[in-house]
Structure formats: structure tokens, C-alpha cells
Swiss-Prot record:
Name the record gives this protein: 33 kDa chaperonin
Localization annotation: Cytoplasm
PANTHER family from the UniProt entry: 33 KDA CHAPERONIN (PTHR30111:SF1)
Gene: hslO
SUPFAM superfamilies, sorted: Hsp33 domain, HSP33 redox switch-like
Any one annotated GO CC term: cytoplasm
Species of origin: Synechococcus sp. (strain WH7803)
UniProt keyword Cytoplasm, yes or no: yes
Post-translational modification as stated in the protein's UniProt record: Under oxidizing conditions two disulfide bonds are formed involving the reactive cysteines. Under reducing conditions zinc is bound to the reactive cysteines and the protein is inactive.
GO molecular function: protein folding chaperone; unfolded protein binding
Family indicated by similarity: Belongs to the HSP33 family.
């Protein structure tokens, strides 16, 4: 089933909840970039988190960019997510694999902390008007969810819980997705409600398991986690938003990027390489430019 995102409020509008499934999206990214299991999971989590952040943007063309800059062997990670449900992303070292570590429940898990190393999470929110808003926070764990929650608390002053997860077996990635829970000003003034919400979030011991049990139904995930808070989709009756991996790169854009190199550099490429080859970082699409096309491009710059 196709990936989807659903928005809801709970507790009479005092709590905002967003759930997203990204299984198909993550599997597509894995095939495009040739990702290992570790980098598949890290990119899947980052794409889920990016979509959760973009879900609150006021305009349909608004976008959020997440960039992990660190000294870890993953060599960086970048995600571009839109309010429209379209997302793309890549990692610097797609084939990275590390030995598993023991998680809190005693099971073997991915070593996100070693993969990410120490560094920062950079977030840019672009509403399509004026200057984009950017913020940087130190990485908390490299697990993505904790890092994004830290960003929301320190940069947007919004108490939030962010859960991202996945399930993998011998057949590959089975599920991927995320859940965002935010306390709105109305609820912040009700200590009992805040305490109940915190209790529900603490009860989420294994988000990946809950995600897998809900399959491709994000609305069931919300009902399962918060049954006593009366979650309601917003706006009522709105179909869930489709989510997909989408990159707007094109041959025309690639040719435009080549012109930025200038005629001298292009002439050198024509003489020595007899053409040019460009690869999109976000989707690994390769664009080849032959001699005639490169010569015409140089002529257009004269």
C-alpha cells in the first residue's frame, strides 16, 4: 500500500499529532542509492522526520531541509521534504555497515550513534516567501528522533515527542514511519493533561513494533497510542495525504548547472573528456552530455 501521512488533534484540540508511513518511500530510496541496511534505516528515519516537520507548514509548496553534519563514518545525510508529501534524500556513505549493538531491551540493533558521530543537525524551513528560517542544534544521539525533538524544543520552543522507526527481516525493510506529538498552548496550561500525555509517550517502549502492527495505516497508529485522548483527523474527513520519493531534477536543470562553470571550464571538459556527466545527489540519476551538446552550451555562453 502507498505511504501516507495523517494529521490529527487530541484532547479537545490541545494536542497535535502527525503520523506517517514511509516504507515504500524508503525502499525506493534504497534501490536508487544502493543503500546498506544501516543507511537505509537512517535515511528512512530522516525522511519520516522531515515529512513530520513539513506537515505543519502553512503553504502547500513549503519545504523543510534536514542536514546531518558530523564526523561520523556516514559522512553526512540530507533530506528535502515538502508539505505536499514529496520527499527526497541521500547519505554521504551509502554502503556503510557497522557491527550491531545491544539496545535497552537486550536485542541487537543498529549503531546509530557511532554512524553519526558528533556533530550538528541543521534545519531549514522555507515557506516560499522571504528568507528561509534556519537553525542548528547539537546531535543528541544520531537516532534522528531525539535529534529532531531537541530541535523543536530549543529552536521552536515547542515541547514535542518524535518517534521514528522501522522493522527489517530477512526479506528486507518491512515498515518505516514516524509519529510527532506536540503540546499546544491550550494543553500546556493543563498539568493533568500534560502528565497524561507524557505517560502515554513513556509507554511507547518499542515504536517500531507498534508501527509494524499498524502496517500502512497511520490513522490506526494514532488510535493505538492515544485511545483515551479522542484523536480526531484535521480537517475532519480529509483524505490522508499521499507520500512519495520525488526528485525534481531534470536534464534541463543539469544543463543549467553546467553553465555556472563558465566557458573556460566547459571548453576544458570538451577537449579532455569529450562531454560531461552529472549525477544528482538526491536521487542518483545520471545525466550524460555529449560533445555536440556541450559545444552548443559553450556557444550559448559566448
Amino acid at each position: 500500500m502507498a505511504d501516507r501521512l495523517v494529521r490529527a488533534t487530541a484532547a479537545g484540540g490541545g494536542i497535535r499529532i502527525v503520523a506517517v508511513t514511509t516504507g515504500e518511500t524508503t525502499r525506493y530510496a534504497q534501490s536508487r542509492h544502493g543503500l546498506s541496511y544501516l543507511t537505509t534505516v537512517m535515511l528512512g528515519r530522516a525522511m519520516s522526520a522531515g515529512l513530520l516537520l513539513a506537515s505543519s507548514m502553512k503553504v502547500s509548496h513549503g519545504r523543510v531541509n534536514l542536514r546531518l553534519g558530523s564526523d561520523g563514518p556516514i559522512r553526512g545525510l540530507s533530506v528535502d521534504a515538502g508539505r505536499d508529501g514529496r520527499v527526497r534524500g541521500y547519505v554521504g556513505n551509502p554502503g556503510l555497515e557497522l557491527d550491531p549493538v545491544r539496545t535497552a531491551n537486550g536485542q541487537a540493533g543498529f549503531d546509530f550513534t557511532s554512524a553519526a558521530g558528533t556533530g550538528y543537525l541543521h534545519v531549514v524551513r522555507d515557506e516560499g516567501k522571504g528568507e528561509p528560517f534556519s537553525s542548528t542544534v547539537e546531535l543528541v544521539s544520531g537516532c534522528i528522533g531525539d535529534d529532531v525533538a531537541s530541535y523543536l524544543l530549543h529552536s521552536e520552543q515547542t515541547p514535542s515527542a518524535v518517534f521514528v522507526g522501522e522493522t527489517i527481516n530477512s526479506d528486507g525493510l518491512q515498515s518505516s514511519g514516524g509519529l510527532l506529538v506536540q503540546v499546544l498552548p491550550k494543553a500546556a496550561e493543563e498539568p493533568a493533561l500534560v502528565a497524561l500525555l507524557e505517560e502515554r509517550c513513556r509507554e511507547i517502549q518499542d515504536f517500531s513494533d507498534q508501527l509494524n502492527r499498524c502496517g500502512d495505516h497511520p490513522e490506526q497508529l494514532i488510535q493505538q497510542v492515544f485511545p483515551d485522548l479522542d484523536p480526531q483527523p484535521i480537517p475532519s474527513g480529509e483524505p490522508m495525504q499521499p507520500v512519495e520519493f520525488h526528485c525534481p531534477c531534470s536534464r534541463e536543470r543539469s544543463l543549467g548547472a553546467l553553465t555556472l562553470l563558465g566557458s573556460e571550464e566547459l571548453n576544458d571538459m570538451l577537449e579532455n573528456d569529450r562531454g560531461a556527466e552529472l549525477t544528482c545527489h538526491f536521487c542518483s540519476e545520471v545525466y550524460k552530455v555529449n560533445e555536440d551538446e556541450l559545444a552548443a552550451l559553450i556557444k550559448s555562453l559566448a
